[in-house]
């Protein structure tokens, strides 16, 4: 009976190891590809790959090293995008600037919506297009959204109303695109998978 039990334990152990080997192999390829992307300065792709590697087997050495890289890259990429978004931005609507101009859907009520971004806060203003008078509507502290430590999402912020917005810039860093990807409620985070609210902002010189 004792020998049978030992055999079953060994058999189970061997089965588990055999099943985990493909995962470790896949994790290794993701990690190596992430390192390659990092060396090429493709930091966004590297972050995504390190994130995948960290989730496959978070307890092994590759998993632990990957999560460290995720944290480092998030910090680096957030600093990079923050350096570019500091300043004033005029809202163009829920379409790209070229589309707004082409269809002539600019706001005509004499009020522009403006946001000013600094290292810690986002200030929302209404600006009278005739008098240029600015009225502060609300202020939001910049708080990055981090559901999981291993998450590859680095440019999402959560506002005081629980809405979560992912932010991105165009190549020239003069158009800011924000999209509502989720909302935090008492029941947890609800992802928005369709009809996401979007906003486009152009840099004010």
Feature names for model-found ranges:
Residues 100-108:
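Surface-exposed strand-loop-strand hairpins of Gram-negative outer-membrane beta-barrel proteins
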Residues 1-23:
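Bacterial Sec-dependent N-terminal signal peptides
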Residues 19-79:
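Alpha-helical protein-protein interaction scaffolds
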Residues 180-205:
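Edge beta-strand at a domain terminus
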Residues 81, 95, 110-127, 205:
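Flexible low-complexity loop/turn motifs enriched in small/helix-breaking residues
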Residues 24, 94-101, 119-186:
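Contiguous, well-ordered beta-strand patches that form the walls/edges
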Residues 91-92, 195:
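Acidic, glycine/proline-rich Ca2+-coordinating loop motifs
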Residues 74-90:
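N-terminal helix-cap/turn-to-beta initiation motif at the start of protein domains
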């Amino acid at each position: 009976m004792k020998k049978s039990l030992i055999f079953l334990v060994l058999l189970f152990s061997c089965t588990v190891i055999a099943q985990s080997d493909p995962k470790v192999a896949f994790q290794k390829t993701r990690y190596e590809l992430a390192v390659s992307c990092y060396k090429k300065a493709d930091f966004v792709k590297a972050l995504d790959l390190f994130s995948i590697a960290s989730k496959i087997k978070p307890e092994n050495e590759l998993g632990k090293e990957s999560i460290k890289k995720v944290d480092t890259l998030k910090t680096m990429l957030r600093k990079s995008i923050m350096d570019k978004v500091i300043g004033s931005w005029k809202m163009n609507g829920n379409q790209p600037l070229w589309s707004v101009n082409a269809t002539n859907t600019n706001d005509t009520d004499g009020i522009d919506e403006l946001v000013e971004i600094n290292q810690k806060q986002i200030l929302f203003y209404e600006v009278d297009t005739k008098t240029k008078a600015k009225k502060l509507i609300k202020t939001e502290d910049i708080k990055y959204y981090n559901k999981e430590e291993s998450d590859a999402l680095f440019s999402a912020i959560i506002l005081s109303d629980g809405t979560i917005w992912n932010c991105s810039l165009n190549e020239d860093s003069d158009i800011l695109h924000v999209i509502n990807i989720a909302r935090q409620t008492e029941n947890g985070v609800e992802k928005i998978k369709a009809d996401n609210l979007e906003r486009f902002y152009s840099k004010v010189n």
